[in-house]
Amino acid sequence: MEHPENSEEYKGLVVNKGIEQPSSVNPYLKRKPKKRQLSVAEFVEGIVKGDVTILSQAVTLVESVKPEHQAVSQEIIEKCLPFSGNSIRIGISGVPGAGKSTSIDVFGLHVLEKGGKLAVLAIDPSSERSKGSILGDKTRMEDLSVAKNAFIRPSPSSGSLGGVARKTRESIVLCEAAGFDTIFVETVGVGQSETAVHSMVDFFLLIQLTGAGDELQGIKRGIMEMADGIAINKCDGANIDRAKVAKAQYQNALHLFPPHESGWSPEAITCSSVEKNGIPEVWDMVERYVQ
């Protein structure tokens, strides 16, 4: 009898019949159909009606780098332009750790108490290595994030300079078309030269800390000369006296700049996001400037 190894069909491996392995895919699984892409008309209709879900989707399209998304978003923006331009745009900037996000949380609630609708566009820095972004600003706005008539949209800077994202202007237009009458643009923690947000907003608020510099900071041409107002944050506890000294120093530094074309004289105000003092005074300064 010829040995089976001499057969041409012999593979050198013998597999005994056993239990068949179950399929890795559940046969009873029902696949959810993909969402249909909304048309431009549906996007515009939803935005104008104040649908924040559709507004978020539209902002995502605007921020996308895909050519097909850019073409659709351009049409959406063009059709939303007639509904925009009716808000107070406030840019909020400052050094990292100055308390911008926490201040916006308290400041935003004050705006909502007056019956307004608030949109916050928070720009978060992107990693130069991984290109990713934590988008953690919203987590610091605990009360505002669950408040009615408030919309918070974190966006990555994606390497854009100037403290804002590449499509911040377009996002502002969409928020205005959705009926938000007050818009905060929170920049990344900026230095003295990143002032792109100034050209996008009506009022540019700079949040500073005590001990961050003396009058020499006022001489340095940069972000301070663009500010319409300075809020010296963390004026609480043992920091109150230092905050008052800083207020006087910044107020003196502001006089070193040429006067604004509008005749407005920038002011320095002390406030505390923790104790919630000085917030009405900051908003009063904004209203006086806008009027």
Q: What name fits each language-model region?
A:
Residues G229, C235-V290:
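Canonical P-loop GTPase G-domain recognition
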Residues I134, S171, A196, M200, ...:
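Alpha-helical scaffold elements adjacent to nucleotide-binding pockets in ATP/GTP-utilizing enzyme cores
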Residues S39-G50, L55-A98, T102-S193, H198-I207, ...:
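Nucleotide-state-sensitive switch-loop elements of NTP-binding domains
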Residues A212-D241:
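Flexible active-site lid/hinge loop adjacent to a nucleotide/diphosphate
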